[in-house]
Regions:
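Charge-rich, well-structured scaffold segments of protease-associated domains
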Residues: 1-80, 106-108, 114-119, 125, ...
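Conserved catalytic alpha/beta cores of large enzymes that bind or transform nucleotide phosphates
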Residues: 145, 150-151
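A generic structural signal for short, solvent-exposed coil/turn residues
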Residues: 43, 88-90, 100-102, 151, ...
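His/Glu-based metal-binding/catalytic segments typifying zinc-dependent metallopeptidases
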Residues: 8, 79-144, 178
Length: 183
């Protein structure tokens, strides 16, 4: 419910403003059975899935079992293209406030949007340096913020930062800071 209030402002000019990636809830609530079957056939395919195995296992045995079970699954012909939609930049700060009686804590989010690292450069030393730099900055800031929560009168209950996707958009990144406030 709170997303319904803030997303139209945060994602103004984008398809995400009024629609989550799963689609319209009206469609989810009222679809015919065949639509669900078609959705499954369209999107549940080998190139969009992964298998994770965790534990003290015999790697060769598990790998053979996975290949036996999943190997026969064929990649469909003429697959649908997975689309990511752009999120425009904004010239002025965007302020969005949402209230909900079930939200028990006040939270403040601050996003600084930026373009993602170019896909074709993700195999370069530059990308490695970029990831190291953003990770180090986030780690140092998070350490400082955590230290503040240990003081006698911290300005917030908890806080943190990260550089990641801009909420649910893959075409825009954001350096995000969040603070859970006392009041």
């Amino acid at each position: 419910r709170m997303y319904d209030t803030v997303f139209p402002k945060m994602f103004a000019g984008s398809k995400y403003a009024y629609r989550l990636p799963i689609g319209s809830m009206d469609i989810v609530d009222h679809f015919p059975y065949q639509d669900l079957r078609d959705y499954y056939e369209k999107w549940y395919r080998p190139d969009l899935q992964g298998i994770i195995v965790v534990g003290d296992i015999d790697v060769d045995q598990i790998e053979a079992k996975i290949k036996k079970i999943f190997g026969p699954i064929k990649m469909p012909q003429n697959t649908a293209e997975r689309k990511y939609f752009p999120v425009p930049d904004n010239k002025e700060p965007i302020i969005a406030i949402a209230k909900d009686k079930e939200q028990q804590m006040n939270q403040v989010y601050v996003y600084h949007k930026h373009d993602p690292f170019p896909e074709e450069m993700k195999n370069t030393v530059g990308y490695l340096v970029y990831n190291y730099m953003t990770g180090a900055i986030s780690s140092m800031l998070n350490t400082r913020l955590q230290e503040l929560t240990q003081t006698a009168t911290p300005p917030f209950i908890n806080a943190g930062v990260e550089d990641n996707d801009f909420v649910l958009a893959k075409t825009k990144k954001a350096f995000m800071g969040v603070a859970i406030c006392k009041d």
